[in-house]
């Protein structure tokens, strides 16, 4: 029987960069300045948190709100933003802000990173993505600030910013846990429209993707002019939200009023 020849598989440049970002984030989170108790966080906990943030899974082995310091939470937020935008898009932001000229090779890399149909106009598209992301996250934070500032004082400003980024990137991280009540998430705001609706909209807008944004931006509400990908994404998203919401509305939350049941179901 002839021997099978297996080619060595090498990590791609994208994989190396992602692993580098995750590892760097983990090392920063290990530092005493990153934890609320000013202790060194075990490597496996820091690595898990960094991986979860970059890959925007929302899984956590420690409560984000009570375990990490403001510095640690900021690191997590930036890791979420990098993961949500993508490493190449984040790198592009640095190039654009620094005013550096972007080469053809770099433009081609950007095209592959976001699966753009062509290289032409890729910098303009990236700029649109970056500006749109920051604008939407800022608007989301501004809408949530009154509620969070009412409940947490000036700390509410930071909480609004963090939750806006987390929701837009579909990351699932929150800062509402305490030492006595960890991992409570947004349960205390389930029927608060000022938080509930804003978080929902941010999740949806961030989830539908950049190309769907462009279709909506260019063609407004003329659905027939959208690309097939955008049509499928929007239709599927609507069905996946409304159908389970109807089920939850009639199945659960029997002790809530109609309006509160609707908010909790959605």
Predicted features and spans:
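Membrane-proximal intracellular helices of multi-pass ion channels
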Residues: 1-266
């Amino acid at each position: 029987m002839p021997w099978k020849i297996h080619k060595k598989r090498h990590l791609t440049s994208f994989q190396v960069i992602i692993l580098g970002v995750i590892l760097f984030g983990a090392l920063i989170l290990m530092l005493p300045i990153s934890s609320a108790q000013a202790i060194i966080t075990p490597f496996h906990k820091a690595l898990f948190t960094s991986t979860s943030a970059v890959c925007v899974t929302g899984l956590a082995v420690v409560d984000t709100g009570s375990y990490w310091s403001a510095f640690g939470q900021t690191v997590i937020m930036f890791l979420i933003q990098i993961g949500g935008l993508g490493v190449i898009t984040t790198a592009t932001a640095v190039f654009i802000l620094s005013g550096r000229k972007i080469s053809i090779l770099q433009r081609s890399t950007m095209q592959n990173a976001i699966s753009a149909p062509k290289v032409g106009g890729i910098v303009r598209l990236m700029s649109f993505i970056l500006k749109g992301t920051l604008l939407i996250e800022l608007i989301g934070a501004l809408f949530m600030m009154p509620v969070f500032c009412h409940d947490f004082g000036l700390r509410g400003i930071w909480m609004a910013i963090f939750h806006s980024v987390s929701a837009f990137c579909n990351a699932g991280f929150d800062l509402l846990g305490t030492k006595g009540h960890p991992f409570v998430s947004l349960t205390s705001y389930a029927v608060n429209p000022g938080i509930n609706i804003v978080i929902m909209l941010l999740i949806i807008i961030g989830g539908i993707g950049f190309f769907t944004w462009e279709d909506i931006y260019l063609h407004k509400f003329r659905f027939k002019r959208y690309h097939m990908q955008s049509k499928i994404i929007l239709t599927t998203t609507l069905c996946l939200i409304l159908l389970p919401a109807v089920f939850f509305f009639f199945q659960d939350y029997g002790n809530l009023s109609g309006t509160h049941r609707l908010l909790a179901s959605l």
